[in-house]
UniProtKB/Swiss-Prot annotation:
NCBIfam families: Hfq, PRK00395.1. GO terms for molecular function: RNA binding. Homohexamer. It comes from Gluconacetobacter diazotrophicus (strain ATCC 49037 / DSM 5601 / CCUG 37298 / CIP 103539 / LMG 7603 / PAl5). Belongs to the Hfq family. Keywords: RNA-binding, Stress response. InterPro entries: Hfq, LSM_dom_sf, Sm. RNA chaperone that binds small regulatory RNA (sRNAs) and mRNAs to facilitate mRNA translational regulation in response to envelope stress, environmental stress and changes in metabolite concentrations. Also binds with high specificity to tRNAs. GO terms for biological process: regulation of DNA-templated transcription; regulation of RNA stability; regulation of translation, ncRNA-mediated. Residues 11-71 form the Sm domain. Gene3D superfamilies: 2.30.30.100. One of its GO terms (cellular component) is cytosol. It holds the Pfam family Hfq. This is RNA-binding protein Hfq.
């Protein structure tokens, strides 16, 4: 039996808003508010693009990431609760998530 890749909600959420180019508001722990589109992320940082400029934001400085539109990461018809519903499309081409 093939073992499915382990996913965490942070990576699934960030990958979803990155792929859909959903505008986000990022609140930092010091209260600063940043807005833009997440273009890339890894275990330690996020690239945020706005008005043609890119900012490198370290994850330890982030308090909250709030998308401009609602994000659905799981199938609400499931009774399992907080199970993340991943498709092959969600994982395709994202070596950092496998």
């Amino acid at each position: 039996m093939a073992k499915e890749p382990t996913q965490n909600v942070q990576d699934v959420f960030l990958n979803h808003v990155r792929r859909s180019k959903t505008p986000v508001t990022v609140f930092l722990v010091n209260g600063v508010k940043l807005q833009g589109i997440i273009t890339w992320f890894d275990n330690f940082s996020v690239l945020l693009r706005r008005d043609g400029h890119t900012q490198l934001v370290y994850k330890h400085a982030i308090s909250t990431v709030m998308p401009a539109t609602p994000v659905v990461l799981f199938d609400p018809s499931r009774t399992e609760g907080a199970t993340v519903d991943l498709t092959e499309k969600d994982l395709a081409g994202d070596a950092d998530l496998l």
